[in-house]
Every structure is written in structure tokens, then in C-alpha cells.
Amino acid sequence: MNGPEDAKLKWEAIRWRSHEDNVRRLRQRIFKATQDGDLATDRNLQKLMLRSWSNTLVSVRQVTQRNAGRSTAGIDGEVALTSPTRMMLAVQVHSQRDSWRPLPVRRVYIPKAGNRAKLRPLGIPVIADRCHQGRVRNALEAEWEARFEPKSYGFRPGCSCQDAIQSIYVTCRGPRAKRVWALDADLATAFDRIDHSRLLEALGSFPAKDMIRDWLKAGVVEAGKGFAPTE
């Protein structure tokens, strides 16, 4: 589970069900340790996840085969759309899991949802960064899924806007719905101005905290403007 024993195999020959089961079980153990308030076990399991070859394979597959942006490159112009390049990327990512230094993201502008006349910025990391982010997410997300409020639906696995709509409907139809407020707000460039110190403080002793700090400071590269640090 913790070494690239599949490195000489063809990408198509990898036993994906086994690797996905390894990641799923480890996520469940992290979730349970967090629920039980066992921080020491939580951190040890997260370290195991971050060393896991299964986690690397599953993360690379998600980025290079399943994600809609798999053919979109970052500032290095690299993508991995063939089996050999995916296998090479997986071995590279796993070998650099403790030494990788994030690169700036490529900033482009895309139409805003619901108002295509307006554009919003989108940061595109290099493909290796996306794979490392997937690895870190599997270690971190399982912990925070146990911490989040049950009625928080944004950017969470298994949650959607339909879940939020249903919750609002049930609340408004409930016996205590005498005065109901709905706030619709658009926070301009909110993610560009997140307080890094508060975010890092919330991570506590998370094993990949230094890599997350590096991602926050990686900055952006925009056509015609060059490099700009993250605010």
C-alpha cells in the first residue's frame, strides 16, 4: 500500500478496486478517529494516507481520467492523457510526495454561472500539483467531514445544491419558521483574500500543513501580466 509496486505494470492492469478500497477504508478510519476525539490516531492515519501508493494512484486517476479539466494544462503545459504518461506521473508524484514544491497557478477567465456577460477568474494548477492536492485532500477531508456542521453543503463530497434546497424547504415548512431570512451574497474575489494565518491555525498539527502553506503562497501567472503573489 505504501510503495509503487505497480510501477512496472501497465496502467490498464492496475487493480483499481483494491486501491480504491484501501483509500476508502483509510478515510473511514480517519473519520472515526476524529469523531472519537483521538487526535494522535487521527494524525498517524493521515500520515499513512499521505504515504499510501493507493492514495497516489487514485488521485492521479481522478485528475487525469475522471476530471473534466484533465486536458487543461497549468503553466508548464503538461497533461497526462495516455496510459504511459499517467503511470509515469504517478511514480513521479509518489517519489516527490515529501519534497514537492508547488508552482504558481495559471489564471484564466470564464463566464460566471447565471450571468455569462460577466467573467470570473479561475486558477489552473499544474497537473502534478492537482495530483498532490488530491492526495492531501483524502487525508484532510475525512477529518473535516467529521467536524463540519451537518447543514453545511458547499464543496463537500456527497452534497449538492439540491440538498441545500431541501433543507431550506423543510426549515421553511417547519413549526418554528415564523421569521425566515435568506441571504444571497457574492463575495468579490473571496478566495483570493482568505486569511492564511487563520486557515493554517485551523489545520493544527495536520501532517501536510507545510505543503498547504506553500500552495497558499504559490501565486498566479496571468497572460499579459506575469506573476502575482497571492494576497
Residues of each region from the PLM?
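Charged boundary/loop elements
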Residues: 8-69, 138-155
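Short, conserved non-catalytic motifs in the polymerase core
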Residues: 67-83, 102-131, 147-160, 182-184, ...
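Generic recognition of stable, solvent-exposed alpha-helical segments in well-folded globular domains
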Residues: 18-21, 25, 40, 44, ...
